[in-house]
Amino acid sequence: MPYLKRVLLLLVTGLFMSLFAVTATASAQTGGSFFDPFNGYNSGFWQKADGYSNGNMFNCTWRANNVSMTSLGEMRLALTSPAYNKFDCGENRSVQTYGYGLYEVRMKPAKNTGIVSSFFTYTGPTDGTPWDEIDIEFLGKDTTKVQFNYYTNGAGNHEKIVDLGFDAANAYHTYAFDWQPNSIKWYVDGQLKHTATNQIPTTPGKIMMNLWNGTGVDEWLGSYNGVNPLYAHYDWVRYTKK
């Protein structure tokens, strides 16, 4: 083989191997399949938000004490009030990030005007990444409905509200989304309810659950009336990597 061709072959091979290594490393950094029945809190797997507020429409401070495990074998997020017109809320998130796959949760949201109970994936500028997010949200003003949404590099406005045919706050049900490169499919108790195919998120995110009260978004959530304590219940979470 002529010298020049041999050099070019080595350069191309090296570039391919470098790209392969980067891809493999990125893949290795995302979490694998798991099932957590919430029989106890795994602090090596999950993190509790504590001591700060998201601000803007979030009218509460995240407190680790507002994330607890109950004797019923469930995780409970609480919305409480330590003082007049001051509110604490609960948020739980995974340590690792997760990519394409099936995300499932068995949960009961809190019921009250002005609040949100959720299950979602998120990554953003504080993580050094674009804002990518996929949501399952319950607006406490009407828990006979569920809202699906997603953000890709900060672009949202993909809300879809689905009538459940039951009150989600009264009993446990399973909610899920299947995130793939060209689509997101949302499910309720195994039944497909909504599909999105445009501008699908690409960045792995942390698995998150939270309960919070809003401010300045009454048209969306309704006005929060100060009722507390309120609780959202999570029986289990499962992720199946695909």
Swiss-Prot record:
Disulfide bonds join C60-C89. It comes from the Bacteria. Its main location: secreted. GO terms for molecular function: licheninase activity. GO terms for cellular component: extracellular region. InterPro entries: Beta-glucanase/XTH, Beta_glucanase, ConA-like_dom_sf, GH16, GH16_AS. Changing P204L: In strain: C120. The modification Pyrrolidone carboxylic acid is found at Q29. SUPFAM superfamilies: Concanavalin A-like lectins/glucanases (SSF49899). One of its GO terms (biological process) is carbohydrate metabolic process. Its EC number is 3.2.1.73. Residues 1-28 form the signal peptide. It is found in: Secreted. Residues 29-242 form the GH16 domain. It catalyses: Hydrolysis of (1->4)-beta-D-glucosidic linkages in beta-D-glucans containing (1->3)- and (1->4)-bonds. The active site is at E133, E137. Keywords: Disulfide bond, Glycosidase, Hydrolase, Pyrrolidone carboxylic acid, Secreted, Signal. Beta-glucanases of Bacillus have a substrate range similar to lichenase of germinating barley. Belongs to the glycosyl hydrolase 16 family. PANTHER family: XYLOGLUCAN ENDOTRANSGLUCOSYLASE/HYDROLASE PROTEIN 8-RELATED. This is Beta-glucanase. It comes from Bacillus subtilis (strain 168). The gene is bglS.
